[in-house]
């Protein structure tokens, strides 16, 4: 990664030999092949290779729309990594289906949302306010009676969202490269095709 990062900064061709232990490139020739290999990597191969969970792997893509955009990728990855089951509750917001176990991201600063950290027995040991743009978490509980969604963020902070604030959340299996600026992830998967040709510039990387 470091070697190729320097090459990118220098405006030179990156090395695609796949001999590196932390950087490799897989060529596929249509969208379905790309989606297939992404699912295989994220669900099966990479977690074993680096001893990580699929949720630790972040997909970054240049655009929101299109066959390999954020919206399509989130739908595909949700269905493969967190498929529906009898024990998982769901809630629909517009075109987005949220399901218990989903990876989500806060998309705007909210200085009023309360969070708390509790013991396994339910005793609150810390609490505060504020959830911020770019924070990522996992949906732990959907209460259809209370109409709330509980998300667990970093350091086990639990935030309870009423349904009317769900527009502040997005699925986050895949996000745009722009949205990821300033963030770090253990593992990154990036799909590129010529359908992204408008965005395919050196500064994108």
Predicted regions and their residues:
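Conserved nucleotide-binding/hydrolysis modules and their immediate coupling elements
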Residues: 75-205
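Conserved helicase motor core of P-loop NTPases
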Residues: 1-129
């Amino acid at each position: 990664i470091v070697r190729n990062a320097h090459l990118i900064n220098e405006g030179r061709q990156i090395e695609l030999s796949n001999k590196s232990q932390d950087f490799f490139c897989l060529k596929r020739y249509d969208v379905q092949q790309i989606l297939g290999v992404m699912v295989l990597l994220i669900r099966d191969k990479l977690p074993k290779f680096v001893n990580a969970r699929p949720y630790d792997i972040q997909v970054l893509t240049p655009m929101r729309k299109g066959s390999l955009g954020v919206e399509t990728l989130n739908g595909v990855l949700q269905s493969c990594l967190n498929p529906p089951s009898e024990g998982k509750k769901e809630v629909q917001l517009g075109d987005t289906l949220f399901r218990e176990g989903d990876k989500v991201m806060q998309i705007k600063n909210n200085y009023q949302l309360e969070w708390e950290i509790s013991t396994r027995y339910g005793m609150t040991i810390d609490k505060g306010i504020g959830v911020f743009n770019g924070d990522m978490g996992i949906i732990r509980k959907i209460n259809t009676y209370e109409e709330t969604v509980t998300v667990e963020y970093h350091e086990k902070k639990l935030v309870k969202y009423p349904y009317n604030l769900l527009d502040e959340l997005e699925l986050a299996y895949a996000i745009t490269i722009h949205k990821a600026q300033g963030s770090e992830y253990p593992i990154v998967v990036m799909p590129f095709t010529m359908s992204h040709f408008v965005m395919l510039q050196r500064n994108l990387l």
